[in-house]
Amino acid sequence: TLALTDVNGLWGFIRFVQHCRSSRINPIAGVNLINNKQEVLILVENQHGYENLCRIISNMHDDPNGDISDILRKYHAGVFVLGYDISILKELSSFIPDSHLFVELRPGFQESTIKSISEELKLEIVATGDVYFKNKTFHKTHMALRAIDCNSTLSDLNEFDYKSEDHWFRSEAEMVHLFPNSLHALNNSKYLADRCKT
């Protein structure tokens, strides 16, 4: 199973599904929803969730700096939502059941910080790769593409405009090495993937 979560869209999803099917990999639809205030990861649970994901993305494009919580309040059925920011997770927990809301542990975050958020909100942790490039050697290419997209030079890129070199595609063993104290979060990612039927 593999999820593609483009930023604010389903840009590569059709090709992703074609490649997954030809490789006998179960594809999961999703999106990394980001604006200048908030960020969440959304994974589709079922067909109704896919329809809601399309509505979420449309609403995000209609109002790019709108409140992600307001959009999800209307369209959270059939999707799983993962976040790492305690303020948006608190807000989302008022209307999304804990069976569909999770704390995201991703590269670059301290396991202890994520664990304390999980304990405070009584939400399970799910580990993700937050992948933006194939391996570490592609980080320079990522930086160059981000500079082009931002109409900037490499030296003038804002740190929020690119990902660190931690965001490469890891094997299961490499994920265990990255998060040695969070094996339950890695198991939860498998459990969540099994629940996604797109």
PLM feature spans:
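Phosphodiester-processing cores and adjacent nucleic acid-binding clamps
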Residues: 1-198
